């Protein structure tokens, strides 16, 4: 690769996700990405989430405090992020091996790109693929859609989307009044 690796910051919002967050963290830390900042924003969980987070002290930054929900947690994490490339990964989602290397390489070699999105798979707790129809639909639209299509349907998978800090500074924070479509609103 000719350009240097950009620093990537991943923010994970969490609340009472002790059963899943360890796998999420492992999927991020196992990426082997050379310049990674990982921030977990926990909403003062009452389950074992904080115990799980303590196991990763020194390998990520985590804060456990009350928040106003998922979007507030994401925004708090993005405010303290130092990466050139930003993303958020929910506490029950996983990155496939090599994902961040592919993202970093793409951003390094295409400095004009403001954001990047890719395909994803949706799996259950036993790693069985679910929602295949929706995933196929979104992945198909990725190849042919444009901004006009995005105004009609959200074909962008949040967990596979990354953007530059400059785009974040231009667009601002996610809209806290939206609880389920904040990502779609952000892409537009």
Question: What spans do the regions from the language model cover?
Answer:
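Glycine-rich, basic loop-to-helix element that forms the pyrophosphate-binding segment
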Residues: 65-81
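Conserved donor NDP-sugar-binding/catalytic core segment of glycosyltransferases
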Residues: 94, 98-132
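Acidic helix N-cap motif at the loop->helix transition within catalytic regions
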Residues: 19-22, 47-55, 94, 98
């Amino acid at each position: 690769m000719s350009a240097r690796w950009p620093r990537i910051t991943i923010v994970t919002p969490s609340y009472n996700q002790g059963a899943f967050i360890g796998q999420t963290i492992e999927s991020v830390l196992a990426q082997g990405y050379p310049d990674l900042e990982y921030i977990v924003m926990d909403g003062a969980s009452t389950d074992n989430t904080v115990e799980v987070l303590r196991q990763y002290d020194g390998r990520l930054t985590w804060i456990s405090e009350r928040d106003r929900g998922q979007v507030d947690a994401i925004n708090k994490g993005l405010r303290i992020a130092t990466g050139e490339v930003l993303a958020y990964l929910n506490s029950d989602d996983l990155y496939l091996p090599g994902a961040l290397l592919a993202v970093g390489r793409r951003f390094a070699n295409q400095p004009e790109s403001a954001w990047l999105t890719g395909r994803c798979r949706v799996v259950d707790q036993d790693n069985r693929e679910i929602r295949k129809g929706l995933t196929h639909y979104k992945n198909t639209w990725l190849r042919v859609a444009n901004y006009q299509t995005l105004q009609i349907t959200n074909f962008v998978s949040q967990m596979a989307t990354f953007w530059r800090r400059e785009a974040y500074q231009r667009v601002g924070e996610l809209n806290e009044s939206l609880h389920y479509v904040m990502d779609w609103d952000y892409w537009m």
